[in-house]
């Protein structure tokens, strides 16, 4: 058993804060329109250049175990903000560091950490309510483009393309991002569908950075029942291996031995495969699988028609240009279905909508209609070099997520202004004791930090700008760090999604509260010996089965 290193009290927190400082200092330089890039060495290929806070945070691991514990906690704030709202990762990092630093000082001075936390929670809840009150719904293409532009670090073209994509497929439509084969940046609408089922095992993931399974030009097997044994499927699996193309299995469920066998062969490289549960329930599930079959020019393998798995061949499988599977969703892009058959299916669903008297059935039929006829907008990102394309693609993905957040909860004045002005509402909060009041003061001071950092990255004095803005009662009055002018942020189009600002603050406060209420830290003691290289396993398989292991 590994021996443990145990640290207590302020010494433990101070070392954790050193790790937090290291990570925050690397991330904070990316904040605002004049934020800088960060170059990250990769284990293979060219270095990665990014201005995305969460990408920088994810790349950092510290040798010192205690400092690393602090850095990992701070990283979790950035990661959570990215997962929930798609942006605000650097803001969350800056806020968490400020809250944790000030909180630790007060704990060291004898304040009760639990009361400090209660005061911070009161303040954060009040600011969240203020953000919700201040938010303004966005409707126009211009406003959508503005959000996309700001979230992509001032790239107008990205903002305009996202607005165009949303116009093509609707604000709730499916939009994906992929690398183009040329220099251009285009929006293309293709046949496609998204449904709310993710991969059945994380071992199917092909892109570990984004935790998604990406299948290029896959075959798609649609099976109505549960799969618990792969024996009947051996002929079709062998045919897929021979074709050297990936396979997506959509079934009622894939369980037990069948799932384990697929995972083993995926890991050993014999079979590029992923499995997901079919969407819907009961009769609706069968109808949705038939929709997918028509979209991909495949067949639903169903015992009602006397079809058996052992008799399935390549011709019965559907195909698509690309399938992307996340933990929650599956997106089928550019299925090879016949246009006439898809149109006939759409007309059939429309007639069912007209005939049904149930509001619930009507809603579900309309969902199916939207999935089948809406299509998928693909943002194709090009560039001169691979490094440039990847960096721009990251920004497009962030901007798309932030734009969706803006459509969902509205927008507020950007550039750190909303948090700064919201801090002024906290002076009226009533608390039970001075320690809780101190917790509120921590939040008031920390809310100034994102704006200070934006201004500092633009080469000006953040404290001076904050002082000048606080003299004004107008909550939209702020500092345009791009043009170095004081403006009405909403009129100038400098806006942030309310969800992004809210999530950044809540995630930062959550992490900071954990740090200031931590009294003991237990980590693995560093080993003097170098760890031996792991043994590499051989490639398992059975003769005549193309390296597959069944």
Swiss-Prot record:
<dbReference type="InterPro" id="IPR027413">
    <property type="entry name" value="GROEL-like_equatorial_sf"/>
</dbReference>
<keyword id="KW-0143">Chaperone</keyword>
<keyword id="KW-0413">Isomerase</keyword>
<dbReference type="GO" id="GO:0042026">
    <property type="term" value="P:protein refolding"/>
</dbReference>
<feature type="binding site">
    <location>
        <position position="496"/>
    </location>
    <ligand>
        <name>ATP</name>
    </ligand>
</feature>
<keyword id="KW-0963">Cytoplasm</keyword>
<dbReference type="InterPro" id="IPR018370">
    <property type="entry name" value="Chaperonin_Cpn60_CS"/>
</dbReference>
<feature type="binding site">
    <location>
        <begin position="30"/>
        <end position="33"/>
    </location>
    <ligand>
        <name>ATP</name>
    </ligand>
</feature>
<dbReference type="GO" id="GO:0140662">
    <property type="term" value="F:ATP-dependent protein folding chaperone"/>
</dbReference>
<dbReference type="InterPro" id="IPR027410">
    <property type="entry name" value="TCP-1-like_intermed_sf"/>
</dbReference>
<dbReference type="InterPro" id="IPR001844">
    <property type="entry name" value="Cpn60/GroEL"/>
</dbReference>
<dbReference type="GO" id="GO:0051082">
    <property type="term" value="F:unfolded protein binding"/>
</dbReference>
<feature type="binding site">
    <location>
        <position position="51"/>
    </location>
    <ligand>
        <name>ATP</name>
    </ligand>
</feature>
<protein>
    <recommendedName>
        <fullName>Chaperonin GroEL</fullName>
        <ecNumber>5.6.1.7</ecNumber>
    </recommendedName>
</protein>
<feature type="binding site">
    <location>
        <position position="415"/>
    </location>
    <ligand>
        <name>ATP</name>
    </ligand>
</feature>
<comment type="similarity">
    <text>Belongs to the chaperonin (HSP60) family.</text>
</comment>
<comment type="subunit">
    <text>Forms a cylinder of 14 subunits composed of two heptameric rings stacked back-to-back. Interacts with the co-chaperonin GroES.</text>
</comment>
<keyword id="KW-0547">Nucleotide-binding</keyword>
<keyword id="KW-0067">ATP-binding</keyword>
<dbReference type="Pfam" id="PF00118">
    <property type="entry name" value="Cpn60_TCP1"/>
</dbReference>
<dbReference type="GO" id="GO:0016853">
    <property type="term" value="F:isomerase activity"/>
</dbReference>
<dbReference type="GO" id="GO:0005737">
    <property type="term" value="C:cytoplasm"/>
</dbReference>
<dbReference type="InterPro" id="IPR002423">
    <property type="entry name" value="Cpn60/GroEL/TCP-1"/>
</dbReference>
<comment type="function">
    <text>Together with its co-chaperonin GroES, plays an essential role in assisting protein folding. The GroEL-GroES system forms a nano-cage that allows encapsulation of the non-native substrate proteins and provides a physical environment optimized to promote and accelerate protein folding.</text>
</comment>
<dbReference type="InterPro" id="IPR027409">
    <property type="entry name" value="GroEL-like_apical_dom_sf"/>
</dbReference>
<dbReference type="GO" id="GO:0005524">
    <property type="term" value="F:ATP binding"/>
</dbReference>
<feature type="binding site">
    <location>
        <begin position="87"/>
        <end position="91"/>
    </location>
    <ligand>
        <name>ATP</name>
    </ligand>
</feature>
């Amino acid at each position: 058993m590994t021996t443990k290193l145990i640290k207590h009290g302020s010494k433990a927190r101070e070392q954790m804060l050193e790790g937090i400082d290291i990570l925050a200092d690397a991330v904070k330089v990316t904040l605002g329109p004049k934020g800088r890039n960060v170059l990250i060495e990769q284990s293979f290929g060219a270095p990665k250049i990014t201005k995305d806070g969460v990408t920088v945070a994810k790349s950092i691991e510290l040798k010192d175990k205690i400092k690393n514990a602090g850095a990992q906690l701070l990283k979790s704030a950035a990661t959570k903000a990215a997962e929930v709202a798609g942006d605000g990762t650097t803001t969350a990092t800056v806020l968490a560091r400020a809250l944790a630093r000030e909180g630790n000082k007060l704990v060291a001075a004898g304040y009760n950490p639990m009361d400090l936390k209660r005061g911070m929670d009161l303040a954060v809840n009040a600011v969240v309510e203020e953000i919700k009150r201040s938010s303004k719904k966005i409707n126009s293409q211009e406003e959508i483009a503005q959000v996309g532009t700001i979230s992509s670090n001032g790239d107008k073209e990205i903002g305009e393309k996202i607005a165009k994509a949303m116009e093509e497929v609707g604000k709730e439509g499916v939009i994906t991002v992929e690398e183009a084969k040329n220099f251009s940046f285009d929006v293309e609408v293709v046949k496609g569908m998204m449904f709310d089922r993710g991969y059945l095992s994380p071992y199917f993931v092909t892109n570990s950075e984004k935790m998604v399974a990406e299948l290029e030009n896959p075959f798609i097997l649609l099976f109505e029942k549960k799969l618990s044994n792969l024996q009947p499927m051996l002929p079709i699996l062998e045919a897929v291996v021979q074709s050297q193309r990936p396979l997506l299995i959509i079934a009622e469920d894939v369980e037990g031995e069948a799932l384990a066998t697929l995972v083993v062969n995926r890991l050993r490289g014999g079979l590029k495969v992923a499995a997901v549960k079919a969407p819907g329930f009961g009769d609706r599930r069968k109808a949705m699988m038939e929709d997918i079959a028509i979209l991909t020019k495949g067949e639903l393998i169903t015992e009602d028609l006397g079809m058996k798995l052992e008799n399935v061949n390549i011709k019965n499988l559907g195909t698509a240009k690309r399938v992307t599977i996340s933990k929650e969703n599956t997106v089928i892009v550019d299925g090879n279905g016949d246009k006439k058959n898809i149109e006939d299916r759409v007309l059939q669903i429309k007639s069912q909508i007209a005939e049904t008297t149930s509001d619930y059935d009507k809603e579900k039929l309309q969902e199916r209609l939207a999935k089948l006829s809406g299509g998928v907008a693909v943002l194709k990102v090009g560039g001169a070099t691979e490094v440039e394309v990847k960096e721009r693609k990251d920004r497009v993905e962030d901007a798309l997520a932030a734009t969706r957040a803006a459509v969902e909860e509205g927008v507020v004045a950007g550039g750190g202004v909303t948090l700064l002005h919201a801090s002024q509402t906290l002076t009226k909060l009533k608390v039970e004791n001075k320690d809780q009041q101190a917790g509120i003061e921590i939040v008031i001071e920390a809310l100034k930090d994102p704006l200070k950092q934006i201004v500092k990255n633009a080469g000006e004095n953040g404290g001076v700008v904050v002082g000048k803005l606080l003299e004004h009662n107008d909550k939209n009055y702020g500092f345009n760090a791009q043009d170095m002018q004081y403006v009405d942020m909403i009129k100038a189009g400098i806006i942030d999604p309310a969800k992004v600002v809210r999530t950044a603050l809540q995630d930062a406060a959550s992490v900071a509260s954990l740090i200031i209420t931590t009294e003991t830290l237990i980590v693995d003691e560093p080993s003097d010996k170098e760890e031996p290289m792991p043994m590499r396993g051989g490639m398992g398989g059975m003769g005549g089965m193309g390296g597959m292991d069944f």
